Amino acid sequence: MNDRVIQMKGYAQRTSNEWPAVGLSVPAWLSDYSNGLVVKGNGNLVRWMHVTPWKQDVESCDRVGLIQAMPAGDSEKDRTGRQWDQRTELMRDAIIYNRNNPSILFYECGNKGISREHMIEMKAIRDQYDPFGGRAIGSREMLDIREAEYGGEMLYINKSEHHPMWATEYCRDEGLRKYWDEYSYPF
């Protein structure tokens, strides 16, 4: 970014980003606090999981300086027919709604790989509705599809010959749901 190499590190956050006892209906300052914890914890990226985050979190990331990967929606695999059409419509709407937010640097087409034809279709949507945004578009498990601009793997293995590889869940530590101490990352 700006001719400098950046090591991306951060969290895969549930898009709902809810707080205990409060739920989803949180004030903007709490979104800033929550996303600011990622930045204070030496993170510089949030990969929202599965669906587009609400506008309050998108704008919060702009304010605190946290890079975002924005998904539109997925079902953990490629789809066909009306289900695929709905995903492309959702990506179109998400791009239009959020294209003026500078912290979004990535558009994610799915939590699982999609076909080459579908990747080409998603790129065409990005090119039509955000032609000058400079955002990369890709998906998990797309390292073998030349049209994808990045690809991700869930656990560590770089299978890429041509693309930047993203270890999308490098440390999937579910243990903190049960055990927590002063050395745990921000909660």
Model-derived features: where do they sit?
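N-terminal carbohydrate-binding accessory modules
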Residues: M1-V39, E59
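Substrate-binding/catalytic cleft of secreted carbohydrate-active enzymes
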Residues: D32-F187
